[in-house]
Amino acid sequence: MSEQATSSGLESRSNGLRERNLQASKSAADRDVASQSLEDKLQVEEGEADTEKKTFGRTPDGTVFTVPPTRDMVSQLLSPSEPKNISDIFVLAILGCHILLLWFLPSSFRVAAFAVIFLFWRASYNIGIGWLLHMQSNGRTLVCWAKKSNIFVNPSTGQNPHPTLYKLLKWELETKISEQYSFEEAPTEYNTWLVFRRVVDLILMCDFTSYCLFAIACGGRPTGESFIMLALRWITGMSLVLFNLWVKLDAHRVVKDFAWYWGDFFYLIDQDLTFDGVFEMAPHPMYSVGYAGYYGISLMAASYKILFISILAHAAQFAFLVLVENPHIEKTYNAPPPRKRVADTDTKPQEDENSHEGSVVSDTLSSAPVIPPLQPSSMHSLLGLHNIDLYRSTDQSVLLAQVLFFALTTLTPSTPVYQFCFVLNAALWRIWYSVGIGYILNRQSNCKMWTRHFVKYGESNHEAWRQWKGTYHLSMTMTYASFIAAAWKMYSFPQDWRYGLVLLRHILGASLIALQIWTSTSIYESLGEFGWFFGDFFFDEFPKLTYSGIYRFLNNPERVLGLAGVWGAVLITSTKSVVFLALLSHTLTLAFIQLVERPHMQKLYGQSLRRDAGLVRSLKRSLPPSLKQIHGSVDKILDDSFEFIEEFIEAARPKLAAGVQTFVKDTSALFQKYPARVTISRLEPDLAGYDLKDYSITLEGTQPSRPAQFERASDKEGERARSMPYRRGEQENLMFEYGAPIKVKWTAPLNHSKKDWVGLYMVTDNTSREVTRVSSQGRWIATNQASFDSETCEQGLISSDIVLKSSRDDGEPRDVASGEMVFSGDKLWWTQGVFEFRYHHNGKHNVMAVSRPFEICIGRFDEDDIEVDNYGLVRAAVEAALLPVVQNCFDRDPEIAPQTVEEHYGCLVDRDGKYSKRVVFAVHHMFGIEFAPEVVRADGNIRNLAWRICNAKKVLAPYSMSRSNGASTPTAAHEED
């Protein structure tokens, strides 16, 4: 179910809770109330109390309504005291059919039949409901269906063609909700949600029932199982089922029916929401720990079939979360904050962290102020396969080391000698990763040892940071590569997968490995590149703690979950050597957290450190006082033990310092388009009633810069083609700016179809002028509102069906319908080329009119037309050229597009990579310099980006063939000199 719900006016906090932004205000009316008699005050307070008991909803168009109280699904269906209607009886009848099917089916068919039935209902849940919610989130499709069919309109108005369905829905919904609800007065969004709920009830109940019946069909007792194992299996299974039941009940207590049935896809509510209980224990508890009952039932049934189908269902639920719920939650509740406004820009230009050759770029380039970033730039990240850069020495070293490990692991025999060598190698790398890296960070925290070394040789703290990231990244990858290699050497394939617990061990081991991968990914998403590489050990000017993501539930997730994979390897291999490596890894990790991370965090953040995470707080609230005292005693024992270890290490430090320093010195130098879908459309039989001469499309847009218009007339052509072509007509070629909105004006007969639409295509995509055979890929706008089952197709529609006086070529007067629409943002092509608009008939692909072809182009920056000095380009001209282009790339949205060169980009630029990719594409064609999208996000404003372009131009100037940009090939005149 939807696990997060809020309303307009709710603001997202770092700890993940969403609370209403209440602003207390005093007015004259308040003072009048204060002067009333005591009786009047009591009446006012009672009225306010009654109002506070109500929940108010708000539709996207701003309509406010009272949200009636509703009952939960199980009570509605199974409680005899609840009134039943036709939909309840229908659901109960379907459930009864499932039970009867189990009773009457032969035992040989039960397992296969109920496996298919359960998979059908699971697909209906994750794929069916998922698709409906996805369409509702992006285009409000369900509400559009309801409005288009008029099923909620009173038949007495004559607009509802389904009076019987109207009466049935009215009786159904008012029977279920008897308080504070009126079918006629409720908004369409709320009524649509109520109907959607009934569909969800059917699918969820059948999904759970078919799963339980499938477990009954597969259940049994393994041969030779002892009574102790039987009791342990059932006790554990029942515990998991009861825990699952508590999770669901507590989650419903917190989020109520509104979020349980994804109400925020339809409307929002105005009320205080506090997320506690199970939502403090685990991320997405409804989909994570909320499926523990599946594994409990699998355990009680003692069937691998149940276990495998449970894993499949759980994976499908996570896919539903990632593909449907998370995007909607991000879009609805985590709106980007307002853009930062910079008033004082009298600062020095930022230094590129990846180069320190200051002599290459003239000091005059930094004469204008550049806004520095708040922390080290992460434009060239290290982690992730997509960030691998073979031009970077760190990535080269990592890849070569991995290839070497793979070759040694696969080409050497698994003899005891080799096994010992691999285990020893893994142990040494783990010791270095925890002890060696821990010592470096400890020295860096206390005396900036790492940074001082680079400053001694004239480097900056950014260079020290860059080298540290390479060292840590190489150490981390080598540690895990050596552990995997050792585990592989100790592993042997089982001869019989059905023997004992072999298969179960592999399943649990793989699950633990997947858990560690997910934990590491969540940690990286919460901390970012800066936190992952312990950036606050190197840059302590910005001490700020945020508990978001996985840190909302755990203070140190790497303490347990972060090492789940090594214990998964223990289960899979079942060897003492891997157990030793797992114990060593876990012990050293705990010591690293206690001796390195914790002291630094206390020193840097002090009292702002959180004592207990959400999970610990929940457990403490549920523990009896005696167990709480035991918990405190255990904490004291651990603290005393680590203090003893720390004192021991401090005493031995002088003996180890010289050797470690030598080791550090000796090793310091080591290191756009989706495929088009072909659509075949037949000519509509009613096209004969329309005159194509009544259809037309005209365009208006922003003209490109002067260099773009004259690029085709240059010295590249023959002598006769070096001037602009002579044009006999009055119309000139249509050329528009890259990313600029284009206004489309259309005309059509008065009786044109309300489902007509206009699409944008490349001229070369369609060979036929009568039928469009290529998908528009979302680049289309409907000519009329409420004609399609989506609101996205209406974005950009300005007007429609305005009657114009017109005349045909023969002089005959004729009235036509006209309209206007604007294509912008995602409805444009973000590339250069020749395009056209096509007017289509009746929701099909029959073409009624085609616009004039027009060209989208990016003019190259003309360096010869600007003033230059002895040091190169003037950055002000680059800034002036970039400003309109960047504004177009950011859809001219005032929330993200800068109005001046100093103004910061909106935060949405960091969240959605499409904006920065548009900018680097334009920069590449304007200046001939290719940047990574991360550069745009890291620079943060146009002034920084212009400085970086000038920097790149100056660095690349010696390799330019232009005399103004650098040394060119010597000529005869040079040779004579």
Swiss-Prot record:
UniProt cross-references to InterPro entries, sorted A to Z: Phopholipid_MeTrfase, Phosphatid-EA_MeTrfase_fun
Q: Where is the composition biased (Polar residues)?
A: 1-15
Name the pathway it acts in: Phospholipid metabolism; phosphatidylcholine biosynthesis
Q: Where in the cell is it found?
A: Endoplasmic reticulum membrane
Signal peptide residues are none
Q: Where is the composition biased (Basic and acidic residues)?
A: 28-55, 341-356, 712-724
Gene Ontology molecular-function annotations: phosphatidylethanolamine N-methyltransferase activity
Entry keywords, A to Z: Endoplasmic reticulum, Lipid biosynthesis, Lipid metabolism, Membrane, Methyltransferase, Phospholipid biosynthesis, Phospholipid metabolism, S-adenosyl-L-methionine, Transferase, Transmembrane, Transmembrane helix
Q: Which domain of life is it from?
A: Eukaryota
GO cellular-component term (any):
cortical endoplasmic reticulum
The EC code for this enzyme is 2.1.1.17
User: What are the transmembrane regions?
Assistant: 89-109, 113-133, 199-219, 227-247, 281-301, 304-324, 398-418, 420-440, 472-488, 499-519, 563-583
> What family is this?
Belongs to the class VI-like SAM-binding methyltransferase superfamily. CHO2 family.
Main function: Catalyzes the first step of the methylation pathway of phosphatidylcholine biosynthesis, the SAM-dependent methylation of phosphatidylethanolamine (PE) to phosphatidylmonomethylethanolamine (PMME).
Any idea what this protein is called?
Phosphatidylethanolamine N-methyltransferase
**Which species?**
Ajellomyces dermatitidis (strain ER-3 / ATCC MYA-2586) (Blastomyces dermatitidis)
Taxonomy, top ranks, is: Eukaryota, Fungi, Dikarya, Ascomycota, Pezizomycotina
Which gene is annotated as encoding this protein in its UniProt record? CHO2
